[in-house]
A protein has these predicted regions:
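Mature extracytoplasmic or organellar-lumen-exposed domains after removal of signal/transit peptides
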Residues: 28-426
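Bacterial N-terminal signal peptides that target proteins for export
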Residues: 2-12
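Bacterial N-terminal signal peptides
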Residues: 10-21
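Sec/Tat signal peptide C-region and signal peptidase I cleavage site
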Residues: 21-27
């Protein structure tokens, strides 16, 4: 990704200002312009996420109407395409409470998939932390939640979101969103750190030649989850529209808006992506710790997270229809204040993107992400570690940018995997 280096003349005066809090009116306007464009890009990204989710929903309709290998593959392909713009929105999660409070409905993971459907015996039959570990709501029209019988005869969107999602207060009870749909399309990946993704047969939805029973309820669940994904993304698209709640919140105070941008960049880079999504799985050599674990699409999701982080700095975004958005950006703001710091930030973002692209290329041509993190895979481990190192290194420069813009103390997300690795094994 090439970061735009064209400086706007109005930003030149920033170099002489001592602190953002004391900027003259015209420079404050420039900070406001950066935040405004940040919100505009958010709206475009969520709108693209909505568009691709609608395409996924249509593909699911076509699959359920005529179950077969081709229609199932088309639904899987639509799911993978839908992940691209959504993962590029994740940089908006941290620093924007409206997004953080909402995102668990669409991208929560990992999930205890036995809540939803049948599982292999290797999954186990119980969990000390989750009484619904093998509830299999598709097979059971009544389930117990907090010791009480709950009617599960209708697997409606309202039931999934209002009753089943995080049932019993357990975060692993993920009933909605991309990963619930992923499980219903692919099934469990039973290959460990060996090759291969989930292999759910299309006949799991074939009412005339049903496998694993309850094909009608499985279809009902899949359609309800897809319907919810569309409606949830519509909500966030509206929140980032001009005058939407998220837009109003971030634009109300330009300085706080800049802090939100950098909080997103730093927290996603360090604690969430480098730590929880990558280093943890690498330390444990555990395929269950990969983000898109049923589909083996994890390397693409991580790459698009990194693209989103870089875009939050550059202000650039290429929409799913090919339209390119550019505008006032942190890159411009930092370059006008400290050219060397901007060059450092740009170089580190690009180095991380190079490492992520190398990981994605390996995922496409040699081995999938769950194989890369396998124990004893020195070369694969090193490819993943290089991407982690890039994320950690760019976070250090994000912290320098925060200081240069005089944004005060910003607490970025951490991770035991990075900060206290011994705790991971306790």
């Amino acid at each position: 990704m090439k970061l735009n280096r064209n400086l706007r003349a109005a930003l030149a005066l920033l170099a002489a200002s001592a602190a953002l809090s004391a900027l003259p009116a015209h420079a404050e306007t420039d900070a406001a312009a950066v935040v405004k464009h940040y919100a505009e890009v958010a709206h475009a990204k969520y709108e693209d996420s909505l568009t691709t989710a609608k395409a996924l929903d249509a593909a699911i309709d076509a699959f359920l109407a005529a179950p077969g290998d081709a229609t199932l593959q088309a639904a899987k392909d639509a799911w993978i395409k839908a992940r691209v713009p959504y993962q590029q929105t994740e940089v908006y999660r941290f620093g924007n409470p409206i997004v953080d409070d909402w995102e668990g409905k669409v991208n929560a993971w990992p999930l205890d998939e036995g809540l939803i459907d049948y599982v292999d015996t290797s999954y186990g039959t119980e969990s000390d932390e989750n009484s619904l570990y093998v509830a299999n709501v598709i097979a059971n029209k009544t389930i117990k939640i907090d010791g009480k019988d709950v009617d599960a005869s209708k697997l409606t969107p309202e039931f999934l979101s209002g009753t089943l999602q995080e049932a019993g207060g357990v975060e692993a009870n993920v009933a909605t969103g991309y990963h619930a749909i992923e499980f219903l399309l692919w099934g469990q990946d039973l290959n460990g750190t060996g090759p291969g993704a989930g292999k759910r047969p299309y006949t799991d939805y074939d009412l005339k030649n049903c496998t694993h029973d309850n094909c009608d309820r499985r279809a009902e669940y899949l359609k309800s989850a897809s319907t919810l994904l569309v409606s949830d993304l519509q909500e966030m698209t509206d929140d980032w529209a001009p005058g939407g709640e998220a837009t109003k919140h971030v634009e109300a105070d330009p300085k706080a808006g800049l802090a939100a941008i950098l909080t997103g960049m730093g927290s996603l880079s360090y604690g969430e992506l480098a730590g929880e999504r990558m280093k943890l799985g690498l330390l444990l050599h555990d395929p269950e710790e990969e983000h898109d674990c049923f589909s083996d699409n994890t390397y693409n999701s991580h790459l698009n997270d990194a693209i989103g982080i870089a875009a939050a700095y550059s202000g650039e975004y290429t929409r799913v229809d090919g339209t390119k958005l550019t505008g006032p950006s942190l890159h411009d703001l930092v370059a006008a204040k400290d050219k060397a710091l901007d060059e450092e930030m740009t170089a580190k973002l690009n180095k991380t993107l190079d490492a992520m692209n190398a990981m994605a290329k390996r995922g496409e041509t040699i081995e999938k992400y769950d194989q890369m993190i396998g124990e004893g895979n020195t070369e694969g481990n090193a490819v993943v570690q290089a991407a982690i190192d890039g994320l950690i290194d760019q976070t250090k420069t994000v912290e320098r940018v925060i200081s240069a813009l005089d944004l005060g103390k910003i607490q970025l997300e951490g991770s035991d995997s990075l900060d206290n690795p011994n705790a991971v094994f306790q």
